[in-house]
Amino acid sequence: MSRLEELIAELCPNGVEYKKLGDIAAISRGGNLQKKDFCAEGVPCIHYGQIYTRYGLFADRTFTFISEDCAKKQKIAYPNDIVMAVTSENIEDICKCVAWLGESTIAVSGHTAIIHHSQNAKYLTYYFHTQMFATQKRRLAHGTKVMEVTPDTLNSVIVPIPPLQVQSEIVKILDNFTELTAELTAELTARRKQYEYYRSAILRSSNTTTEKTLGEICDFVRGPFGGSLKKENFSKEGYAVYELQHAIYGDFKFRYFVDKAKYDVM
Protein backbone atom coordinates (compact mmCIF):
# COMPACT_ATOMS: atom_id res chain seq x y z
CA MET A 1 0.00 0.00 0.00
CA SER A 2 1.38 3.42 -0.97
CA ARG A 3 1.75 6.30 1.47
CA LEU A 4 -1.16 8.07 -0.25
CA GLU A 5 -3.40 5.03 0.10
CA GLU A 6 -2.46 4.76 3.79
CA LEU A 7 -3.37 8.40 4.41
CA ILE A 8 -6.67 8.08 2.59
CA ALA A 9 -7.56 4.94 4.56
CA GLU A 10 -6.64 6.65 7.83
CA LEU A 11 -7.95 10.19 7.31
CA CYS A 12 -10.87 9.80 4.92
CA PRO A 13 -11.94 6.14 4.97
CA ASN A 14 -15.43 7.05 3.76
CA GLY A 15 -14.15 8.93 0.73
CA VAL A 16 -13.07 12.46 -0.11
CA GLU A 17 -15.50 15.27 0.60
CA TYR A 18 -16.55 17.52 -2.28
CA LYS A 19 -17.25 21.18 -1.60
CA LYS A 20 -18.12 24.31 -3.51
CA LEU A 21 -15.15 26.58 -4.08
CA GLY A 22 -17.13 29.41 -2.48
CA ASP A 23 -17.34 27.39 0.76
CA ILE A 24 -13.57 27.08 1.13
CA ALA A 25 -12.32 30.29 -0.49
CA ALA A 26 -13.01 34.00 -0.83
CA ILE A 27 -12.95 35.03 -4.48
CA SER A 28 -12.39 38.63 -5.56
CA ARG A 29 -11.70 40.46 -8.80
CA GLY A 30 -8.29 41.79 -9.76
CA GLY A 31 -7.48 45.50 -10.00
CA ASN A 32 -6.93 47.81 -12.93
CA LEU A 33 -3.16 47.97 -13.37
CA GLN A 34 -1.94 48.06 -16.97
CA LYS A 35 1.32 47.30 -18.73
CA LYS A 36 2.09 51.01 -18.93
CA ASP A 37 2.28 51.02 -15.11
CA PHE A 38 5.28 48.67 -15.08
CA CYS A 39 8.56 50.03 -13.73
CA ALA A 40 12.06 48.70 -13.10
CA GLU A 41 11.50 48.05 -9.39
CA GLY A 42 8.90 48.51 -6.71
CA VAL A 43 5.90 46.41 -5.72
CA PRO A 44 5.77 43.01 -7.46
CA CYS A 45 2.76 42.48 -9.70
CA ILE A 46 1.15 39.96 -12.03
CA HIS A 47 -0.66 40.99 -15.21
CA TYR A 48 -3.28 38.53 -16.42
CA GLY A 49 -1.63 38.18 -19.84
CA GLN A 50 1.57 36.96 -18.17
CA ILE A 51 -0.30 33.99 -16.70
CA TYR A 52 -0.64 32.68 -20.26
CA THR A 53 2.80 33.62 -21.52
CA ARG A 54 5.33 33.72 -18.68
CA TYR A 55 4.17 31.76 -15.66
CA GLY A 56 3.91 28.07 -14.95
CA LEU A 57 1.67 26.63 -12.26
CA PHE A 58 3.54 28.20 -9.34
CA ALA A 59 5.61 31.33 -8.74
CA ASP A 60 7.57 32.85 -5.87
CA ARG A 61 8.74 35.92 -7.75
CA THR A 62 7.21 38.17 -10.39
CA PHE A 63 8.57 39.38 -13.69
CA THR A 64 7.26 42.93 -13.33
CA PHE A 65 6.77 45.69 -10.76
CA ILE A 66 4.74 48.85 -10.22
CA SER A 67 5.33 51.91 -8.09
CA GLU A 68 4.11 52.06 -4.49
CA ASP A 69 1.69 54.86 -5.38
CA CYS A 70 0.15 52.73 -8.14
CA ALA A 71 0.01 49.69 -5.85
CA LYS A 72 -2.12 51.55 -3.31
CA LYS A 73 -4.95 51.63 -5.87
CA GLN A 74 -4.71 47.96 -6.82
CA LYS A 75 -6.14 44.67 -5.61
CA ILE A 76 -3.70 42.57 -3.63
CA ALA A 77 -2.94 38.85 -3.55
CA TYR A 78 -1.37 37.30 -0.47
CA PRO A 79 1.06 34.38 -0.14
CA ASN A 80 -0.76 31.10 -0.87
CA ASP A 81 -3.43 32.89 -2.95
CA ILE A 82 -4.18 31.69 -6.46
CA VAL A 83 -4.40 34.17 -9.33
CA MET A 84 -6.62 32.97 -12.16
CA ALA A 85 -6.97 34.58 -15.61
CA VAL A 86 -10.69 34.73 -16.39
CA THR A 87 -10.50 36.21 -19.91
CA SER A 88 -9.10 34.37 -22.93
CA GLU A 89 -9.40 34.10 -26.69
CA ASN A 90 -10.30 30.41 -26.40
CA ILE A 91 -12.09 28.09 -24.02
CA GLU A 92 -9.06 25.84 -23.51
CA ASP A 93 -6.88 28.54 -21.93
CA ILE A 94 -9.47 30.34 -19.86
CA CYS A 95 -9.07 29.96 -16.08
CA LYS A 96 -5.35 29.18 -16.33
CA CYS A 97 -3.93 30.06 -12.96
CA VAL A 98 -0.76 30.44 -10.92
CA ALA A 99 -0.31 29.87 -7.20
CA TRP A 100 1.55 32.73 -5.54
CA LEU A 101 4.15 31.12 -3.24
CA GLY A 102 6.26 34.22 -2.61
CA GLU A 103 6.70 35.81 0.82
CA SER A 104 5.26 39.24 0.04
CA THR A 105 1.94 40.53 -1.21
CA ILE A 106 1.59 41.33 -4.91
CA ALA A 107 -0.62 43.59 -7.00
CA VAL A 108 -2.89 41.89 -9.52
CA SER A 109 -4.34 43.24 -12.77
CA GLY A 110 -7.90 43.07 -14.04
CA HIS A 111 -9.35 40.09 -15.95
CA THR A 112 -8.34 37.91 -13.00
CA ALA A 113 -9.89 36.23 -10.00
CA ILE A 114 -7.95 36.20 -6.73
CA ILE A 115 -8.70 33.03 -4.77
CA HIS A 116 -7.91 33.38 -1.05
CA HIS A 117 -8.08 30.09 0.87
CA SER A 118 -6.54 27.94 3.60
CA GLN A 119 -5.91 24.80 1.53
CA ASN A 120 -2.69 23.60 -0.09
CA ALA A 121 -2.20 26.12 -2.91
CA LYS A 122 -0.35 23.68 -5.14
CA TYR A 123 -3.06 21.05 -4.69
CA LEU A 124 -5.80 23.47 -5.76
CA THR A 125 -3.72 24.70 -8.68
CA TYR A 126 -3.14 21.17 -9.90
CA TYR A 127 -6.88 20.57 -9.61
CA PHE A 128 -7.64 23.71 -11.65
CA HIS A 129 -5.73 22.10 -14.52
CA THR A 130 -7.68 18.83 -14.51
CA GLN A 131 -10.36 17.63 -16.90
CA MET A 132 -12.85 17.65 -14.03
CA PHE A 133 -12.41 21.40 -13.61
CA ALA A 134 -12.29 21.98 -17.39
CA THR A 135 -15.75 20.45 -17.72
CA GLN A 136 -17.10 22.88 -15.13
CA LYS A 137 -15.42 25.97 -16.53
CA ARG A 138 -16.91 25.29 -19.97
CA ARG A 139 -20.36 25.64 -18.44
CA LEU A 140 -19.39 28.94 -16.81
CA ALA A 141 -17.64 30.55 -19.80
CA HIS A 142 -19.48 32.94 -22.08
CA GLY A 143 -18.58 35.09 -25.08
CA THR A 144 -17.72 34.65 -28.75
CA LYS A 145 -14.46 36.27 -29.86
CA VAL A 146 -13.35 36.69 -26.25
CA MET A 147 -14.29 34.11 -23.64
CA GLU A 148 -14.89 35.14 -20.05
CA VAL A 149 -15.74 33.55 -16.72
CA THR A 150 -17.25 35.92 -14.18
CA PRO A 151 -15.29 35.56 -10.91
CA ASP A 152 -18.47 35.32 -8.85
CA THR A 153 -19.60 32.22 -10.75
CA LEU A 154 -16.45 30.37 -9.65
CA ASN A 155 -18.07 30.02 -6.23
CA SER A 156 -20.20 27.19 -7.61
CA VAL A 157 -17.25 25.09 -8.82
CA ILE A 158 -17.10 21.70 -7.09
CA VAL A 159 -13.70 20.75 -5.66
CA PRO A 160 -12.57 17.51 -3.96
CA ILE A 161 -11.16 18.53 -0.57
CA PRO A 162 -9.22 15.77 1.19
CA PRO A 163 -7.42 16.50 4.49
CA LEU A 164 -4.32 18.68 4.20
CA GLN A 165 -1.99 15.72 4.76
CA VAL A 166 -3.55 13.95 1.80
CA GLN A 167 -3.33 17.12 -0.30
CA SER A 168 0.36 17.38 0.56
CA GLU A 169 1.04 13.78 -0.48
CA ILE A 170 -0.83 14.28 -3.76
CA VAL A 171 1.25 17.39 -4.44
CA LYS A 172 4.46 15.48 -3.73
CA ILE A 173 3.49 12.81 -6.28
CA LEU A 174 2.49 15.36 -8.93
CA ASP A 175 5.63 17.43 -8.33
CA ASN A 176 7.78 14.36 -8.93
CA PHE A 177 5.85 13.53 -12.07
CA THR A 178 6.18 17.11 -13.34
CA GLU A 179 9.93 17.04 -12.70
CA LEU A 180 10.33 13.75 -14.55
CA THR A 181 8.26 15.08 -17.44
CA ALA A 182 10.45 18.19 -17.64
CA GLU A 183 13.61 16.06 -17.63
CA LEU A 184 12.22 13.82 -20.36
CA THR A 185 11.21 16.83 -22.45
CA ALA A 186 14.70 18.31 -22.08
CA GLU A 187 16.26 14.98 -23.07
CA LEU A 188 14.03 14.67 -26.14
CA THR A 189 14.82 18.25 -27.13
CA ALA A 190 18.55 17.58 -26.83
CA ARG A 191 18.25 14.36 -28.84
CA ARG A 192 16.25 16.16 -31.53
CA LYS A 193 18.92 18.85 -31.84
CA GLN A 194 21.60 16.17 -32.02
CA TYR A 195 19.66 14.32 -34.72
CA GLU A 196 19.15 17.51 -36.73
CA TYR A 197 22.87 18.32 -36.46
CA TYR A 198 23.96 14.93 -37.78
CA ARG A 199 21.26 14.95 -40.45
CA SER A 200 22.48 18.34 -41.66
CA ALA A 201 26.09 17.15 -41.57
CA ILE A 202 25.25 14.06 -43.60
CA LEU A 203 23.12 15.87 -46.15
CA ARG A 204 25.44 18.83 -46.52
CA SER A 205 26.93 18.82 -50.00
CA SER A 206 30.64 18.04 -50.09
CA ASN A 207 33.23 16.25 -52.20
CA THR A 208 32.88 13.11 -50.07
CA THR A 209 29.14 12.60 -50.51
CA THR A 210 27.06 11.65 -53.50
CA GLU A 211 23.35 11.71 -54.08
CA LYS A 212 21.54 8.62 -55.33
CA THR A 213 17.95 7.64 -55.82
CA LEU A 214 16.44 5.08 -53.49
CA GLY A 215 16.10 2.71 -56.44
CA GLU A 216 19.88 2.76 -56.93
CA ILE A 217 20.59 1.46 -53.45
CA CYS A 218 17.54 -0.68 -52.70
CA ASP A 219 15.62 -3.55 -54.24
CA PHE A 220 11.84 -3.18 -54.08
CA VAL A 221 9.63 -6.25 -53.88
CA ARG A 222 5.87 -6.01 -53.69
CA GLY A 223 4.43 -7.91 -50.74
CA PRO A 224 1.95 -10.72 -51.47
CA PHE A 225 -1.73 -9.92 -51.59
CA GLY A 226 -4.05 -11.54 -49.04
CA GLY A 227 -4.88 -14.48 -51.30
CA SER A 228 -1.23 -15.53 -51.53
CA LEU A 229 -1.04 -16.33 -47.84
CA LYS A 230 -3.81 -18.46 -46.40
CA LYS A 231 -4.24 -20.03 -42.98
CA GLU A 232 -3.21 -23.43 -44.27
CA ASN A 233 0.18 -21.93 -45.23
CA PHE A 234 1.02 -20.96 -41.66
CA SER A 235 3.17 -23.06 -39.35
CA LYS A 236 4.01 -22.85 -35.65
CA GLU A 237 7.58 -21.79 -36.37
CA GLY A 238 9.82 -20.84 -39.24
CA TYR A 239 9.96 -17.52 -41.10
CA ALA A 240 7.96 -14.69 -39.50
CA VAL A 241 5.18 -13.06 -41.54
CA TYR A 242 5.52 -9.27 -41.57
CA GLU A 243 2.07 -7.64 -41.48
CA LEU A 244 0.78 -4.16 -42.19
CA GLN A 245 0.17 -3.54 -38.48
CA HIS A 246 3.89 -3.95 -37.80
CA ALA A 247 4.66 -0.99 -40.07
CA ILE A 248 1.83 1.15 -38.67
CA TYR A 249 2.25 0.55 -34.95
CA GLY A 250 5.88 -0.54 -34.70
CA ASP A 251 4.78 -3.63 -32.79
CA PHE A 252 6.96 -6.56 -33.81
CA LYS A 253 5.13 -9.38 -32.07
CA PHE A 254 4.75 -11.84 -34.91
CA ARG A 255 1.58 -13.93 -35.01
CA TYR A 256 2.20 -16.07 -38.09
CA PHE A 257 5.07 -18.08 -39.59
CA VAL A 258 5.70 -20.03 -42.79
CA ASP A 259 8.04 -22.94 -43.41
CA LYS A 260 11.08 -22.82 -45.71
CA ALA A 261 9.23 -24.33 -48.67
CA LYS A 262 6.63 -21.56 -48.67
CA TYR A 263 9.28 -18.94 -47.97
CA ASP A 264 11.34 -19.98 -51.02
CA VAL A 265 8.44 -19.55 -53.46
CA MET A 266 7.42 -16.13 -52.21
Per-range role (PLM):
Residues 8-31, 204-225:
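Non-catalytic DNA-recognition/assembly elements of restriction-modification systems
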Residues 10, 32-33, 70-71, 101, ...:
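Short, solvent-exposed loop/turn positions at domain surfaces
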Residues 15-17, 155-192, 196, 209:
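Amphipathic alpha-helical segments
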Residues 16-21, 43, 77, 81-83, ...:
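Short, structured motif recognition centered on aromatic/hydrophobic residues
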Residues 22-25, 34-67, 78, 215-218, ...:
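DNA target-recognition patches
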Residues 47, 62, 68-131, 243-245, ...:
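A short beta-sheet element
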Residues 105-111, 142-162:
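A short glycine-rich beta-alpha junction/loop motif
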Residues 150, 163, 201, 207-210:
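Structural preference for solvent-exposed beta-strand-turn elements
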